[in-house]
């Protein structure tokens, strides 16, 4: 199991980024959370198999239709054993 924290910058709020991330994570058995930040970015934590988490990072780099991703920060973290994916 691996865990990555991503912060996505660009036009990423108001384009269903969080909901699409939640649905995509659910289809890949990835746990964690996603939230809007006050600075206009979207932040997420993904936990799961290396392959599934890498797929989520690739998704974050593209975003849903309507998003304009400019930059993505990715940081490895220690897994915490999360059991669900939530939008906060």
Question: Each predicted region: which residue ranges?
Answer:
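Intrinsically disordered, low-complexity, mixed-charge
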Residues: 1-88
């Amino acid at each position: 199991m691996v865990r990555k924290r991503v912060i996505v910058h660009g036009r990423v709020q108001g384009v269903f980024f969080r909901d699409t991330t939640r649905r995509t994570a659910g289809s890949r058995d990835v746990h964690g959370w996603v939230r809007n930040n006050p600075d206009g970015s979207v932040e997420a934590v993904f936990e799961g198999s290396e392959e599934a988490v890498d797929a989520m990072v690739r998704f974050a780099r593209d975003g849903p239709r309507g998003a304009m991703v400019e930059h993505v920060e990715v940081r490895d973290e220690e897994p915490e054993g999360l059991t669900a994916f939530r939008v906060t």
